[in-house]
């Protein structure tokens, strides 16, 4: 058995994983779908344990357990949950355990990656989440909104005449809209208008939160972006930002190596 740690981030859309060495470097990593895919762990050395963040429910937990058991029977497993304090981060939630494990691990990863900086962490998945993290590691609170895809899908499902637009289709529509400078960012047909409107709603939320946080804290705040829809939302942002797409796995590595 190696000193490596298997890290698993089970979100609502995909399951991401990494194998981290004793220096918390990712030796290898990947992602797979919940039902239709599986990771190839056949050549990986046996880790000393698995650290799991799961916000996708019981079915995802059972599948992860089955995958681990098939490759490394009886491997020790730790299901990560938010706590009052861990790895230099303190939890400002009134009930700390109710904070999602992915958000908690992401906060720990962000605090380590950008030490001594005030942060606003925006993660774009099924939901869009924002976390306000002070330079001293105190999580001051957050916001949760529908993600870009969920926002577009909700309009298609709950209105009589609006279409349901996927992320891939919306991205192509926005490319077309950007080529027509005479109208951008305003669209002259419904699919373009829906795609651009939901994208601008995401960007507007982020920019408003960032400006409000800098005003409240009277100090610079680094805006950190993460998540699958970040590529699209970046195109609508007009404020400085930094990308970091492994915050949760980085946080899980820190939690694992502090155990």
UniProtKB/Swiss-Prot annotation:
Name the pathway: Cofactor biosynthesis; coenzyme A biosynthesis; CoA from (R)-pantothenate: step 1/5
Keyword ATP-binding belongs to the record: yes
Question: Main localisation, per the record?
Answer: cytoplasm
Alphabetical GO biological process terms: coenzyme A biosynthetic process
Q: What is its EC number?
A: 2.7.1.33
CC cofactor: NH4(+); K(+)
Cellular component GO terms, alphabetical? cytoplasm
Reactions performed catalytically? (R)-pantothenate + ATP = (R)-4'-phosphopantothenate + ADP + H(+)
| Active site per UniProt | 102 (proton acceptor)
Where is this protein found? Cytoplasm
InterPro entries for the chain: ATPase_NBD, Type_III_PanK
Residues holding substrate: 93, 100-103, 190
Give the residues the record marks as binding ATP. Answer: 9-16, 126
Q: Which UniProt keywords apply?
A: ATP-binding, Coenzyme A biosynthesis, Cytoplasm, Kinase, Nucleotide-binding, Potassium, Transferase
Q: Which family does it belong to?
A: Belongs to the type III pantothenate kinase family.
Q: What is this protein called?
A: Type III pantothenate kinase
